[in-house]
Amino acid sequence: MGEVILSMTNIHKAFGPVRALRSAALELQRGEIHALAGENGAGKSTLMHIIDGILQPDGGEILLDGKPVRISSPNAANRLGIGFVHQEIALCPEISVAENMYMSETGQSRSWFMNYRDLEKRAATVLREIGDIDPTHRAGDLSISQQQIVEIAKALTLDCRILILDEPTAALTETEAQTLFKIMRRLAARGIAIIYISHRMAEIFEHCDRITVMRDGCHIRTENIADISPEEVVNSMVGRVLDKLYPPKLADDEKSNEVILSVRGLNEGKRVFDVDFDLRRGEILGFAGLIGAGRSEIARAVCRLEGKPKGEVVLRGRSLKLRDYRDSIREGIVYLSEDRKGDGLFLNMSIATNVSALDIGRISNGMGFIQRRKEMKRADELGRRLKLRANSVGDAVSTLSGGNQQKVALAKMLSVEPEVIFLDEPTRGVDVGAKAEIHRQIRELARQGVGVVVISSELPELIGVSDRVLVVREGRITGEVEGDDMTEEKIMQLASITIMQNAAEA
């Protein structure tokens, strides 16, 4: 057994009548990578916020190096050597990468001038270990994945003894994720203890040493990774034997040959080039490719969400004249954004208001006034259909777990009864139970005749849920796989062939 650096026992925390933690516990050893698993709402975030000093426990004991400690604030946590990389990006967009990484120094400097050249040099040294990002760039100009890398680099600038990583690979490419895992191992070899929160079982079992499972605010079990299986972890998380993560696919004789959506010659600026594809009625079509390959850009161009794309979009044999996204919605083609909190949901508004946002006409009277009873009823119907967990559809979306927020975003799309729906990273940051439910709903939509396009960075998910997968690279569709050919190896091979072809042509 390794040296215990942090011990938390019998931790309790309540918010009014809601008991978020009940006898929670965690033991962290020096130099280990310790996974923390549980469904959204299990209490993981509350427990981590107590370690980070954001919240104070109502009861229980916290020992650091065997001594009782009270972590009164995030600054106190930093002084104790505790760093936290949150799932949601919290960079200041208007200043440089280097200034974000060393914000505490720039804010506390007593001199009139900061040595920004030195700051940038130090930032570049840290960033070289993670990703090739210019420390002088404005943070707001970076992609989501690049901003996530900066968040991780920012935490590494602290003299950490304990590092908390909350879904750190959610927006990273496979290459970036593998780089992060190497850095985690180097940090662990230096004696830093890492708490790794993720819903991705493959990552947990490949890179973590031990795992603690939480459910309903309680500690369920802590095991060595070698002594437990992914199935046992999932069953401990949900408190039951979970049905298959992916619902059965359609048999060949159940598939339709009717093309519901046909896209030809789609071009948009310098991001989408000569894209052609067909989507059949009741089909789930996957878009595979690395982050930045152009998968989202293709979907957004079809829906007229940005730029001025050229090309033909044909729905059920009828060529559409789409000027903007409102036209797309009216025609029954909708897009669920990968950034549900940025442009998918109104967090401070009610569930009902969010669900009805795309279809105000359905719940308005003849004079244009919203009929709240209709709004609530419609939201309640869709909430039950998606097994939304909330006290009331009048609750603010911000009070929900990540998985339930995603269900609200999906309900918002379903409210317009679409014929085609693009789902961009539909299960990102969602726990395994909610993931299985979303997969079931996607298949149910397809069975009702809706054409579904799923964009996901998780190849197992794409393969598990899709009937057919298109490979996208540099804004172009470069390959197609289905049936027995739909394997991770084949998809990656297609991407590699494209890379080699591009190199040869250059």
Curated annotation (Swiss-Prot):
Its EC number is 7.5.2.7. Its main location: membrane. It catalyses: D-ribose(out) + ATP + H2O = D-ribose(in) + ADP + phosphate + H(+). It is found in: Cell inner membrane. InterPro entries: AAA+_ATPase, ABC_carbohydrate_import_ATPase, ABC_transporter-like_ATP-bd, ABC_transporter-like_CS, P-loop_NTPase. The keyword Protease does not apply. Keywords: ATP-binding, Cell inner membrane, Cell membrane, Membrane, Nucleotide-binding, Repeat, Sugar transport, Translocase, Transport. Transmembrane segments: none annotated. One of its GO terms (cellular component) is plasma membrane. Residues 6-241, 254-499 form the ABC transporter domain. The complex is composed of an ATP-binding protein (RbsA), two transmembrane proteins (RbsC) and a solute-binding protein (RbsB). Belongs to the ABC transporter superfamily. Ribose importer (TC 3.A.1.2.1) family. This is Ribose import ATP-binding protein RbsA 2. The gene is rbsA2.
